[in-house]
Amino acid sequence: LGGLSKKAWQIRRISTEQQKPSLFVDSGNLLFKQVQLPDGPSQELLTAEGIIKIYRTMKVDAVAVGPLDLASGLGILTHSRQQGFPWLSANLVDEEGRPLFAPMLIKETGNIKAGIIGLTGAVTSLPPGVTLADWRTLLPALLEETSAQSDILILLSSLSPAENQEIARQFPALHLILAANQHSGNMMPEQVKNTLITQTATQGKYQGILTIDWHKSGRWGKTQGTELTELRNRIGALDWQLQRMRRRVDLQQPDYLDKIKLVEQDREAVIRQVKELEQALAADHSDGQNAACTFNHNFLALERSMAETPEIRAIITGIKEQIQALHASRIRKDVDIPLLGHKGCMSCHQAQ
């Protein structure tokens, strides 16, 4: 809980320094550390209510419902949703198959519309009347609907790593999967077809930062300038290789001449790639349609020495005071226990 004031300060600092449009999202398993809680007031429930209050103060854009978020049932989730907390889950449904939370939302950041979908992973014990629908059934239509309204498609997922990989392979229109797997730590962005998959370690020890240079192509890749430089360097390397090969004494051997021919063909193919890329770059200068989308990432460790946001620190202090009051109410103080004396003992024990 204490790390949230540092997280808030870092998010504010980065937003101020970069002066770029941004989204603050969470893929779930936010509220609790165990799969189920007993009924009634508890330290865990007070902490969860505090986390929701802090995230609202931090103006979170979207949070997917994770399995651990259901540890105390639907009550805290439903209440906070009614107050405007942006819970998402496309596959948590009631007995009639109706979503219990918004399946997706569209957030506009700068001049880009981000379509954000939430999927909940396997739940050990579902609350009464709640069903976990198969994402394979509902996701195709939901992606089509969301894609029509957005420029970039983002999935907040607490599904297993294997399922996230399956989604990336099956739905290349999805640009980004932010995972919340309980057993994984910080995950470097991995590209599967045209989908990036990444996640930040659990328990709020790190702040994950993904900076995206987005273009209309919606295609991840190197910058075309970098790719062009690499191709030109490749031509230089092939030229050097051909010079060495042509100096060989066995130049008249048919097999060796065939090897030279293959390298020459490789060089010609790279030259064609360079010309095509130069043409694409010229077109990008006019409309930017073909430019690749690029990114960089950082996992920022939230250390004790970091600065904190005062308003968040005040909320945390209030939560701790509520927890102390809860514990105090459970301790019986100043209870008089009468001294029985020998007469009281004689009612049960024989005199000796």
Residues covered by each model-derived region:
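Acidic, metal/ion-coordinating pockets
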Residues: L1-Q324, K333, I337-L340, C348, ...
